[in-house]
């Protein structure tokens, strides 16, 4: 029954779909309090891809490898990066700590996810804001690279 209701909501219109996902991610962020869960993708493995990770990052090696693969398609060093759909912030944190951009901003529709990120991360070149991927609150050319992995 619940599944049927959700499917009806998702099929009504793009705005009802957006409303549902915003609510869903807020509920998830409020209730999934385990701050060890920083990434929500399935991960990536490729022979020869060997990242030297800090011990605390090893538990999420494969999801981090997906971010590494995607982000390294461009030279991110000293660039301003925007991650759209930053979720729990693990990808933006990885990029900020390992790939040496000038800055990383994570934007997510879930205010609860952004509040969680603000509590978890204290990295000088990393910040998070609430925002909508369909109406990004920055002027054109504010960022050098846009990354979207988990949405």
What are these regions (language model features)?
Residues 110:
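Conserved SAM/SAH-binding beta-strand->alpha-helix loop
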Residues 88-100:
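Conserved SAM-binding loop of SAM-dependent methyltransferases across substrates and taxa
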Residues 134-145:
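A short acidic, Gly/Pro-enriched loop at the edge of an enzyme's catalytic core
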Residues 1-38:
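N-terminal auxiliary segments of SAM/dcSAM-dependent transferases
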Residues 79-87:
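Conserved class I S-adenosyl-L-methionine
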Residues 117-118:
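Conserved SAM-binding loop
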Residues 60-77:
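Conserved alpha-helix/loop element of class I SAM-dependent methyltransferases that forms part
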Residues 123-134:
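Conserved SAM-binding strand-loop segment of SAM-dependent methyltransferases
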């Amino acid at each position: 029954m619940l599944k049927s209701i959700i499917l009806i909501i998702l099929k009504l219109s793009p705005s009802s779909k957006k409303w549902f996902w915003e609510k869903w991610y807020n509920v998830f962020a409020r209730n999934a309090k385990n701050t060890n869960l920083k990434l929500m993708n399935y991960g990536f493995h490729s022979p020869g891809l060997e990242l030297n990770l800090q011990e605390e990052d090893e538990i999420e090696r494969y999801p981090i490898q997906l971010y590494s693969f995607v982000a390294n398609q461009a030279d991110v060093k000293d660039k301003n990066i925007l991650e759209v759909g930053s979720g729990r912030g693990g990808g933006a944190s990885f990029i900020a700590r390992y790939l040496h951009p000038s800055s990383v901003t994570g934007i997510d529709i879930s205010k609860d996810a952004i509040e969680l990120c603000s509590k978890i991360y204290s990295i000088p070149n990393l910040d998070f804001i609430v925002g909508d991927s369909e109406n990004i609150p920055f002027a054109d050319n504010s960022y050098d690279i846009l990354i979207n992995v988990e949405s």
